[in-house]
């Protein structure tokens, strides 16, 4: 997957189109990413037993995963770009910006 944890991305489709955020977590097997402040849902949490020490129940707002095809990485210039790969002089695979050709 071309998007990793810590990348800054912009949402390119869906209800949150245009929103920017940082990738909190990536799920490569499911092709999804968790983006900070994007695709927020309300989750109903049951009251937990007091001996477990968990927080009380209620409605919690949290981020839900979004498909990787609906986000685009933002390069150093602040513009969205596609991601490509190249090998550096040591033979290591490096991600590059398709728009500028620079390393990400």
From Swiss-Prot:
GO molecular function, one term: rRNA binding
Keyword Nuclease attributed: no
Family matches, as SUPFAM superfamilies: Translation proteins SH3-like domain (SSF50104)
Entry keyword annotation includes Ribonucleoprotein: yes
InterPro entries: KOW, Rib_uL2_dom2, Ribosomal_uL24, Ribosomal_uL24_CS, Ribosomal_uL24_KOW, Translation_prot_SH3-like_sf
Cellular compartments per GO CC: ribonucleoprotein complex; ribosome
One GO process term, biological-process aspect: translation
Pfam family membership, one: KOW
Superkingdom of source: Bacteria
Alphabetically ordered keywords of this record: Ribonucleoprotein, Ribosomal protein, RNA-binding, rRNA-binding
Coiled coil: none
Main function: One of two assembly initiator proteins, it binds directly to the 5'-end of the 23S rRNA, where it nucleates assembly of the 50S subunit. One of the proteins that surrounds the polypeptide exit tunnel on the outside of the subunit.
UniProt family annotation: Belongs to the universal ribosomal protein uL24 family.
Subunit field text: Part of the 50S ribosomal subunit.
PANTHER family recorded: MITOCHONDRIAL RIBOSOMAL PROTEIN L24
Protein name listed in UniProt: Large ribosomal subunit protein uL24
Species this protein is from: Corynebacterium kroppenstedtii (strain DSM 44385 / JCM 11950 / CIP 105744 / CCUG 35717)
Lineage: Bacteria, Bacillati, Actinomycetota, Actinomycetes, Mycobacteriales
Gene symbol of the encoding locus: rplX
